[in-house]
Amino acid sequence: MVESHLTDNKYIRYFCYVMLFELFLLGSGQDLPLAGGLTLRWLNFFIGVGASVYMFVRSDDFPKSILAFILVYTAQLLIGWMLAFVFDSEMAYLMVDFKPLLYFYIVLFFYYMMTSELMIKRVVDILLLCVKIMTVLYLIYMTLTDVLGLFSMTGENYHSVDDSGSFMFRGVGSSLFYKGFVYLPIGALGFFWRKQYVWMALSILAIYFTYTRGLYVLLAFGLLAFYLKTHEVNIFKIVGLMLVVLLLYEVAEVLEIFQFDDTYLENREESDSVRLITIDQVFDRITWWSLLVGHGFGQGVPERPAHMEISYLDIFHHQGLFGLAFWVALFIAILKYGNSVVGKFKEEAAFFMTAAMMIFLQSCFNPYINNSIGMSITLLAFVICYRLSQDEYFTSRSTV
């Protein structure tokens, strides 16, 4: 059966929309438990993977590049598991490290769904709708609390509001940080691309009221990178811009530039100290073999037994240079495929390529690339840029 017949199934399409809506709006995905620890996100994942296996068996389309990434990724996970058993990792910590990484296998489902111009447009539509919802709700919340003072919701810095840790007080007035807020700068970029400047301004205002330096940097980088890419600037210069932005961020941290006003007094000393201690403990435990393949899942450090703040540090500790090389290769593949798209779909490729770069950049500070929040937009960028670069596979025919 040809692939287009499979994606013509309206129920599969509607399921895909529900999955994307949940991914973009519900942050970590832990706030909608169904039964026995199963959440809506993981239910969607299992359905999506099952559908993708069915599509793979019935379709005559075999994406060799994507399958190669899946095989290498699987090899990584197997090595991580073997090392975990060699070093007798605690099962609880092992699963905490391993479970989020499974979400990578949704990539094949995304591939088989992104088969038309309008399907890709729907992804952007759903993303921007979710950003609008987050923007409006957060601005209403901040207006009622800090602006009008009708009620107050204050807490200590980085104090979790809920059990899942999806919401945290910032320590500045009633401001909150929500894990899904990483999509606010990406949404602002989408509004800029689509010339929806009112929504762009509102989303930027919401970003301001998060009092989160990383989101400010992400917003500035995303807008500048997208502008440069759509104005024929070489992609290597944009990657260089990523490194410059990262350097400037660190300089700003040292000079306390973000603390020129009481509004920006985030009191990040404790959080920064945890990062530095974690880095030191990770490097203290490097051996010749861990340098290559890591210590395996479930092997943390005293400061962070699981889930290190910096994604790349977490990947390096558990999977070594082999693990980091995989994500570097994926990053290069996204740039390669996205940069090869010319003509009609150039701006679509530029948007998703920039969104992926924003996630890769933010993962220098927070754990995004190695969980479903960041992995989803990165895999969508990979698949969509791959699709758009393959003229023989992509069609503008609507299946929506």
Language-model segment annotations:
Residues 1-58, 78-84, 141, 359-361, ...:
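N-terminal signal-anchor transmembrane segment
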Residues 2-4, 187-254, 341-344, 350, ...:
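Hydrophobic alpha-helical segments of polytopic membrane proteins
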Residues 42-43, 68-78, 89-113, 126-131, ...:
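Aromatic-anchored transmembrane helix interface
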Residues 124-152, 170-228:
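Alpha-helical transmembrane segments of multi-pass inner-membrane proteins
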Residues 140-146, 230-266, 283-288:
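A membrane-periplasm/extracellular boundary helix in multi-pass inner-membrane enzymes
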Residues 262-319:
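Long extracytoplasmic/lumenal interhelical loops at the membrane interface
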Residues 304-340, 361:
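A conserved mid-to-late transmembrane alpha helix and its immediate loop/hinge
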Residues 352-360, 368-400:
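Transmembrane alpha-helices of multi-pass inner-membrane enzymes
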